[in-house]
Amino acid sequence: MAKLLAMILAGGEGRRLDPLTRDRAKPAVPFGGRYRIVDFVLSNMANSGILKMKVVVQYKSESLNTHVQRAWRLTSLLNQYVELVPAQMRVGPKWFEGSADAIYQNLNIITDEEPDFTFVFGADHVYRMDARQMLEFHLDRKAELTVAAVPIPVQEASEFGIIEVDADGRMIGFVEKPQSAPKTIPGDPTRCLASMGNYLFSTDALVQEIVRDAGDPSSAHDFGKSIVASMYQRKRVYVYDFARNVVPGQTERERGYWRDVGSIDAYFQANMDLVAVDPVFSLYNDEWPIFTVQYNYPPAKFVFNNEHDHRVGRATDSLVSEGCIISGSHVHHSILSPKVRVNSYATVDESIVFENVNIGRHCRIRRAIIDKHVDIPAHTTIGYDHEKDRKHFHVTESGIVIIPKGMRIEAGR
């Protein structure tokens, strides 16, 4: 049986997710109520039976470190592990200078473990994937590198590495974040083939390429710009079509679902994808669960049913986590993390509320993301007057209001 190792790159700063990333790395941002973004890649690896994982961290990693240590305890008796790898300056007094450099500075891990194949996956995407099917493709093609790819609308091409392939799936072109007209999928001028940032290497090839790249002073030391863009011209680089990946328990509608949640708008929409009656991505797949830390909180509680004065505790088309209390208020099309309290006569609509938030009586909240440890005073209105909101909060061009972690909001704002 082949020896496998997963290197999970979780050191991303996530500037486009500011202010959600002011105090945490992007993979540590909460998602779907009770998860962190990093849980999706780790769950995919665990469900695929790849049980040796190194999580490479750097930027504001305390929250991420704490989460991984609490949630991801595999059994050492079977040599299974999820281990954190902080920046250690092993090759000199410098931090990681790119995703490829993060691997170079930790090559000792790979050479010590001696895997036959090494997965190098990002930690900031939402999806389900059986990574062993990618391995089967890699072996079948006798590839040295396999890149997972997904079709995207052509107008989004400037945000991704865009790939061109031949009829056998071999990479024949690659441009990182093209600023001019990108290559489209043959027969489909509306879509491009984008790299998912997930790579599978034959380990010998990985070590050779990483060492070669480290010795190039002109390199950006980035997997897309530097490794893939160079390697496909010289070696056997193939592209795995993620749309072919079949996950147990997944509906046909969910197949191929993958979201880069690197911007506020993309993050918000991916969360909203979860609350539909028939969602395009369901958290309720027992055959391929998303694992996370288990809280010792009581069940969610809904209280008051006074229809005559509109004091009814209810939630519709929403995800409400453990420890929440919906007290005579209405939550609609929203996601609540643990220990959120929504008090009487308040309404929360199309919003994402992080842990330990209190929403006062008669508040009206719409299209907002509220970070942890925020107390919203009674009668506060958010999301209904963007000009007023911009004086106090961050508001995106699409009208999403973000309230940073621990922000103090004055009564009567």
Swiss-Prot record:
Q: Tell me its EC number(s), please.
A: 2.7.7.27
Q: In which pathway does it act?
A: Glycan biosynthesis; glycogen biosynthesis
Q: Which reaction does it catalyse?
A: alpha-D-glucose 1-phosphate + ATP + H(+) = ADP-alpha-D-glucose + diphosphate
Q: Which UniProt keywords apply?
A: ATP-binding, Carbohydrate metabolism, Glycogen biosynthesis, Glycogen metabolism, Nucleotide-binding, Nucleotidyltransferase, Transferase
Note one Pfam family from the annotation.
Answer: NTP_transferase
User: Binding residues for alpha-D-glucose 1-phosphate, per the UniProt record?
Assistant: 161, 176-177, 195
List the GO biological process terms. Answer: glycogen biosynthetic process
The molecular function GO annotations come to: ATP binding; glucose-1-phosphate adenylyltransferase activity
Q: What class of enzyme is it?
A: transferase
- The domain of life for this entry's organism is Bacteria
Q: Describe the family membership recorded for this protein in Swiss-Prot or TrEMBL.
A: Belongs to the bacterial/plant glucose-1-phosphate adenylyltransferase family.
Subunit structure comment from the entry: Homotetramer.
What is this protein's function? Involved in the biosynthesis of ADP-glucose, a building block required for the elongation reactions to produce glycogen. Catalyzes the reaction between ATP and alpha-D-glucose 1-phosphate (G1P) to produce pyrophosphate and ADP-Glc.
What is the protein name for this chain? Glucose-1-phosphate adenylyltransferase
- Look up and give the organism this protein is from: Anaeromyxobacter sp. (strain K)
Q: Which gene encodes it?
A: glgC
